[in-house]
UniProtKB/Swiss-Prot annotation:
Belongs to the UPF0677 family. This is Putative S-adenosyl-L-methionine-dependent methyltransferase MSMEG_1482/MSMEI_1446. S-adenosyl-L-methionine binds at D130, D159, L160. NCBIfam families: mthyl_TIGR00027 (TIGR00027).
């Protein structure tokens, strides 16, 4: 079903299902012969959501070789990409903590379990923002598992399209303190103008010493829209063939959008960036062939 202006979702539908898909990839990466990450909560959370296809993927008896070679290769690529992405944002938060930051915000937190698995320093506060149904589900699922946060975790149940800064402040966020923000797997699901608004809101809430890390899907030229849409459809068809029906072309916004690095630089931030291929190589993982990529993902880090 196509996106609408104020659409909502749970973790088994629409944009929410992509969070479950990514958690399944983290579980696969965690269980790899040479794991690049360790997320012990990924598989249990996927099982709690209960989407049959993803539950099978995280089963201890799942045999990747039982899939056709093309599907197995694609799944391995996806798990590697999510492992590298996870490491990037983990390292970003840990680097910020070592620099003295004690206030952390996860935008569109989905099934992110960093508040439960990272070694946070004393005095840290981690704010998780997502839609109410998503926040409620994950909080209960982790409680049912007996999991306890390793820091002061504060769940902020609000849609990022609404007045989330007010909800964040009400939860105890202090805009006078340096903050580390992450927007992981988020911007592509926002219209271009909503992306700009989100970056503006982050800037308004960021004291000197703050930093932000963003996964950016660069603007796709209009003449390339059909090709990218075709690749997304092919990706969706492959998932559908194995029992998961989600049309990615209906979830993302392909319109022209601001370059994140340039936008942040224009608002007083100093930025560095790394491509997805560079990130894979940095983590000792194989890069992706150009023909297998859907757009060029860039990981941006900014400080002020």
């Amino acid at each position: 079903m196509a996106r609408t202006e104020n659409d909502t979702w749970d973790l088994a539908s629409s944009v929410g299902a992509t969070a479950t898909m990514v958690a399944a990839a983290r579980a696969l990466a965690t269980n790899a012969d040479e794991p690049a990450i360790d997320d012990p909560f990924a598989a249990p959370l996927v099982r709690a959501v209960g989407v049959d296809f993803f539950t099978k993927l995280v089963d201890d008896n799942f045999d990747l070789t039982a899939l056709d070679p093309e599907a197995a290769e694609g799944l391995t690529r996806f798990a590697n990409g999510m492992a590298a992405r996870t490491r990037f944002f983990d390292d970003f938060f840990l680097d910020a903590a070592r620099a003295g930051v004690r206030q952390f915000v996860i935008l569109a937190s989905g099934l992110d379990a960093r508040a439960y698995r990272l070694p946070w320093p004393a005095g840290s506060v981690v704010f998780e923002i997502d839609q109410p149904d998503v926040i409620e589900f994950k909080t209960k699922a982790l409680a049912d598992l007996g999991a306890l946060p390793t820091t002061d975790r504060r769940a902020v149940a609000v849609d990022l399209r609404f007045d989330w800064p007010a909800a964040l402040t009400e939860a105890g966020f202090d805009p006078a303190e340096p903050t580390a923000w992450i927007a992981e797997g988020l911007l592509g699901y926002l219209p271009p103008e909503a992306q700009d608004r989100l970056l503006d809101q982050i800037a308004e809430l960021s004291a000197p010493g703050s930093r932000v890390a963003v996964e950016e899907i660069p603007a796709i030229e209009e003449e390339d829209h059909e090709e990218i849409a075709a690749r997304m459809k092919d990706f969706s068809d492959r998932w559908r063939a194995h029992g998961f029906d989600l049309d990615f072309t209906e979830l993302v916004f392909l319109g022209d959008r601001a370059d994140v690095s340039s936008y942040l630089q224009g608002h007083g931030w100093k930025t560095t960036s790394m491509t997805s291929d560079e990130l894979l190589v940095h983590n000792g993982l194989p890069r992706v062939d150009d023909d297998a990529q859907i757009g060029s993902v860039v990981y941006v880090t900014a400080t002020r």
